Amino acid sequence: MNPGEFDQLVEAAFRRIPARFRKRMANVALIVEPEPPPGRVGPGYTLFGLYEGRPLTHRSVFEPIAMPDRITIFQGPHERLARSPEHLASMVEDTVWHEVGHYFGMNEAQVRAAQRRRRTNR
């Protein structure tokens, strides 16, 4: 898949996040990269996305405005593991939701629990 098509999958996944959450996402950049940076993930692990920033729950109104937080979605790992175009779109959506959960201050266990609930409610 070319990068533009993958970007469209990421954008569509982000648009499916309920507006009440998207409205609260200020100063965050949604970025697509071909691969995770070397050394970011250990052997035997796959990194689909990465949230970098200060979670919303850890911010103060007294803090100065900072550089944008970043949610990066990695194209290569998704494409290598996807079994079909539909599966790829589903994986991308799961990854976007996962990283948005981190933006809102959820730890890994909380994000995974929310993902399980979301999957059963689809």
Question: What spans do the regions from the language model cover?
Answer:
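Amphipathic alpha-helical interaction/coupling elements
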Residues: 9-12, 91, 95
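Active-site scaffold of zinc-dependent metalloenzymes
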Residues: 47-93, 103-122
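Short alpha-helical functional segments enriched in proximate histidine and acidic residues
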Residues: 16, 20, 95, 99, ...
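Hydrophobic/basic alpha-helical segments enriched in Actinobacteria
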Residues: 22-23, 27, 88-90, 98, ...
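An acidic/histidine-cluster motif and surrounding catalytic segment
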Residues: 1-43, 49-63, 77, 115
